Curated annotation (Swiss-Prot):
Cysteines joined through disulfide linkages: none
Subunit composition and interactions: Homodimer.
Similarity remark: Belongs to the peptidase M20A family. DapE subfamily.
UniProt-listed Enzyme Commission number(s): 3.5.1.18
UniProt organism field: Blochmanniella floridana
Annotated protein name in UniProt: Succinyl-diaminopimelate desuccinylase
Binding sites annotated in the UniProt record for Zn(2+) 1: H71, D104, E167
Length: 384
């Protein structure tokens, strides 16, 4: 088992699949699934590679579907000279696999696939259906990935009962945290207009940087939620970029014409896109500035009520790893926000998240084996 896990994880890491480029990952995955008699349906959209794959049990008319969902795309590695080993080498050192995507989430994909092979070899006449959704557009816009697949599946009345997403949910040990929801996200750009002028004559200019300071203070100190959420962390804002126009580094005696501020909200079930938009506009109206506000992207929060799948996973992790998993909704967005539309119970369970998107991203071989074992045990509980 461990040799298969290492080989498959390395094969996937060695594909430099920077979002949304799949870069041959899905061929590796589909070849693996075809050898297990899966039906493979490509659902490519624009520049994104997608697959829907499934294998029926012995009853093709009345069955439960367990879906594994994941992504093959990764974020850029940054300066490769800062890496201990080349980011797309899949180097193993001291029982740790290094490489971009090792924990987010090519290791989890390999663990799912190897667990599926082990399950089918042990139970070739299983009752229920196993399915996979794989996309190369999760780290990017998400427009052409799982969102498109789910839309097609809903249109043709595909039924999904349970879903495991291989996002890196664990904090210190595999299975110590599982997620059943995520906050929503919305990104905006605020342009504050001033007037350019000589710094020695403040009476003849409007410095947009000065105009922005009290606005920034207000934005960062506002309580956005009407009530405390019992399901999610508080709604929060982060400023992501700040720059002026024109950018003039050759002199320090001129003020800019405009200040451009990019920001991102992570919002819970006590706030909405509409309420955030309204509150931002109310704040800006109090400062008598000329501005333009543009909203660039959004995703809604999702929450999956704990049910049979959660109970199964908690029991497995307690029994085999002596850990009581914490159930929470922290972290960034995930494709669970699209899959929730199917009505499936969703859990995110994957590798440790302490090196994701970082230089020297890695996954421990012991953790990889544990993750695959947990997936296998879940299949035993649901698919037989």
């Amino acid at each position: 088992m461990i040799n298969d896990l290492i080989t498959l994880t390395q094969q996937l890491i060695r594909q430099p699949s920077i979002t949304p480029n799949d870069c041959n990952c899905q061929k590796i995955i589909t070849d693996y699934l075809k050898s297990l008699q899966f039906n493979i349906e490509p659902m490519n959209s624009s520049n994104t590679s997608n697959i829907w794959a499934y294998r029926y049990g012995y009853d093709q008319k009345k069955y439960t579907t367990l879906l594994f969902a994941g992504h093959t795309d990764v974020v850029p590695p940054g300066d490769i000279h800062n890496w201990q080993y080349p980011p797309f080498s899949g180097t193993v050192h001291n029982n740790i696999i290094y490489g971009r995507g090792s924990s987010d989430m090519k290791g989890a994909l390999a663990a799912m696939l190897v667990a599926t092979k082990s399950f089918i070899q042990k139970y070739p006449k299983h009752k229920n259906r196993i399915a996979f959704i794989i996309t190369s557009d999760e780290e990017g816009s998400g427009i052409h990935g799982t969102k498109k697949i789910i839309k097609s599946l809903i249109h043709r009345h595909e039924h999904i009962n349970y879903c495991i997403i291989g996002e890196p949910s664990s904090n210190n040990k595999i299975g110590d945290v599982i997620k059943n929801g995520r906050r929503g996200s919305c990104t905006g750009k605020l342009v504050i207009h001033g007037s350019q002028g000589h710094v020695a004559y403040p009476q003849f200019l409007k410095n947009p940087i000065h105009l922005a300071i009290p606005i920034l203070s207000k934005l960062l100190n506002t309580m956005w939620d009407q009530h405390k959420s019992t399901l999610f962390p508080d709604t929060s804002i982060q400023i992501t970029h700040l720059h002026t126009i024109p950018i003039n580094y050759s002199t320090n005696n001129i003020t800019p014409e405009q200040l451009i501020l990019n920001f991102n909200f992570r919002f819970n079930d006590q706030s909405t896109m509409h309420s955030i938009h309204n509150n931002i506009n109310k704040i800006l109206s109090n400062y008598h500035v000329t501005y333009h506000l543009h909203w660039e992207s959004k995703s809604e929060p999702y929450f999956s009520a704990p049910g049979k799948l959660v109970n199964i996973i908690i029991d497995i992790i307690k029994k085999y790893y002596n850990i009581t998993p914490q159930l929470n909704t922290t972290g960034g967005t995930s494709d669970g926000r699209f899959i929730i539309q199917t009505g499936a119970e969703i859990i995110e369970l994957g590798a440790l998240n302490n090196t994701i998107h970082k230089v020297n991203e890695c996954i421990d071989l012991v953790d990889l084996k544990s993750l695959s074992h947990i997936y296998f045990k879940i299949m035993e509980k649901i698919l037989l």
